[in-house]
């Protein structure tokens, strides 16, 4: 039906070999790439044409994770607004993507949403069962990411999400944190543990 048509000025032809789940050189499907840039219309078109919305990258990232903010966008790649990304997250979730799946790094969709600074996505994920204290392989929780564990490299810190996550039940004692994010009492305890 939509194949060979026009979607906002883009030609929408079926792949020549009919494989709607073909992996690109980075190990990602067209559906996952559409989720990554929050293109809900393309995501829906691909599903309508038979794409499998449950396929992950070879690193284990799901389309829901990509839409939420897991992974690094290429220079010039537009991840969409937080509102558009929320719609992509909702569609991936409605199509069966699990909010608590983690990739090979232990990152979940919630880690990505916090890194992205998207409180709307954070709330949606938590409302649908995401683990607020999930720890990735580096020992980082969503709260530690909001506090700025990436800050030295990305200058990415979200104080408003720190408050939001704690209000929604995040445990401040879970996950690794930067020394400068610790209270004076916590710094003293850490120093005593090292001695």
Task: Go through each PLM region and give its residues.
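Solvent-exposed, polar/charged alpha-helical surfaces in well-ordered, non-transmembrane soluble domains
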Residues: 32, 41-44, 65, 87-90, ...
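Terminal, low-structured helical/coil segments at or just beyond the last alpha-helical repeat
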Residues: 157-195
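Intrinsically disordered, low-complexity segments enriched in small/polar residues
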Residues: 7-20, 77-79, 188, 193-195
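Ankyrin repeat A-helix N-terminal signature
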Residues: 21-25, 33-39, 66-85, 112-119, ...
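Ankyrin repeat boundary signal
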Residues: 9-11, 22, 53-56, 99-102, ...
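Ankyrin repeat domain, specifically the short helix-to-loop turn at the C-terminus of the second helix
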Residues: 1-6, 44-52, 87-98, 123-131, ...
């Amino acid at each position: 039906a939509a194949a060979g048509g026009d979607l906002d000025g883009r030609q929408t032809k079926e792949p020549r070999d009919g494989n709607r789940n073909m992996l690109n050189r980075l190990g990602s499907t067209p559906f996952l790439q559409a989720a990554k840039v929050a293109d809900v219309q393309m995501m829906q078109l691909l599903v309508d044409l038979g794409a499998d919305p449950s396929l992950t990258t070879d690193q284990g990232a799901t389309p829901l994770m990509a839409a939420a903010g897991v992974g690094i966008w290429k220079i010039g790649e537009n991840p969409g607004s937080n509102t558009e990304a929320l719609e992509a997250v909702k569609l991936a979730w409605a199509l069966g993507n699990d909010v608590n799946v983690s990739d090979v790094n232990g990152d979940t969709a919630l880690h990505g949403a916090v890194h992205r600074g998207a409180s709307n996505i954070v709330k949606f994920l938590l409302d649908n069962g995401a683990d607020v204290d999930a720890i990735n392989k580096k020992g980082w929780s969503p709260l530690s990411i909001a506090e700025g564990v990436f800050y030295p490299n990305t200058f990415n810190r979200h104080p408003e999400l720190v408050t939001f996550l704690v209000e929604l039940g995040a445990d401040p004692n879970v996950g690794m944190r930067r020394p400068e994010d610790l209270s004076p009492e916590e710094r003293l305890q850490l120093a005593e543990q090292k001695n």
